[in-house]
Amino acid sequence: MNTVLFSPYTTRGLTLKNRIVMSPMCMYSCDTKDGTVRTWHKIHYPARAIGQVGLIIVEATGVTPQGRISEHDLGIWDDDHIHGLHELVGLVKEHGAAIGIQLAHAGRKSEVPGEIIAPSAIPFNESSPTPKEMTKADIEKTVQAFQDGARRAKKAGFDVIEIHAAHGYLINEFLSPLSNRRQDEYGGSPENRYHFLGEVIDAVREVWDGPLFVRISASDYHPDGLTVKDYVPYVKRMKEQGVDLVDVSSGAVVPARIDVYPGYQVPFAEFIRREAGIPTGAVGLITSGWQAEEVLHNGRADLVFLGRELLRNPYWPYAAAKELGVKIEAPVQYERGWRF
């Protein structure tokens, strides 16, 4: 059987062997608290490459120490991080997968001790600390930190960079009127609220000529927040700036009750793909081979991003291939167990 799921996908000169992407998921496993790659990362990510995932995106990696979600996150704010990341890249590529990294700043959702920063001095919830409103100097330093992170990612050998503009972290905080009450050129109108992300994309593109993805939260799930329709002009601008694919998630900029069900975010990816004319990745409770194939076959997205499913089963591509009646190449060491 010919499937879209197991067909190659090419973006900006990089060809993935299939359309299966490991979604960036924080492991909170840097026990040294210095942002460096640890043994866990060297086992966790290559295991999915052995499992035949096409593209593995490393978890949200802090572009500054205070930009981490927690002290146990990976970092890319210092040249000392390059060696460990380079080693991780080599291990993943050795087993046939492409590898990307998600550059991130947690903004007001950072749980690192010390001062936290955000577009406006609005806490995430009642139990969260109030962040410092960023000055223009803070903004300039943070844009520079994203560029420096991209430069280090290139030195480490990554194939793809994804900018984290979702889930209520710093860039998402600038985009949403729920968290951005600024009165300068970085707040107010939708165009102004996009300004920070626009500067980050331009800064990254100055030093990075490879595939560039952006993860977005296509709905704030709040009557006064952003909807998927609001994201269409944002994504069109991203495309003009050289973004190659938008990874479409949703929520988490403010506390909200979200009804989740199989493929609940796929319609967002489909809408963005159709209305903005850009390749998209679908993510969120995609669990079976047939479900993933339906999303791709019907043109609802170009790639499928799997999160928890790949935590449960590093060899999900094999299970999906068996389900769809597709024979895929097995690691030589596993051939006896992968025959069907």
From Swiss-Prot:
InterPro entries linked: Aldolase_TIM, NADPH_DH_bac, OxRdtase_FMN_N, YqjM-like
Keywords assigned? Detoxification, Flavoprotein, FMN, NADP, Oxidoreductase
Names of required cofactors: FMN
> A biological process (GO) annotation for this entry?
response to toxic substance
Q: Which Pfam families match?
A: Oxidored_FMN (PF00724)
Name the residues that bind substrate: Y28, H164, A165, A166, H167
Name the catalysed reactions: A + NADPH + H(+) = AH2 + NADP(+)
The role this protein plays is:
Catalyzes the reduction of the double bond of an array of alpha,beta-unsaturated aldehydes and ketones. It also reduces the nitro group of nitroester and nitroaromatic compounds. It could have a role in detoxification processes.
Family annotation (HAMAP family): NamA
- Describe its partners and assembly state: Homotetramer.
Q: What is this protein called?
A: NADPH dehydrogenase
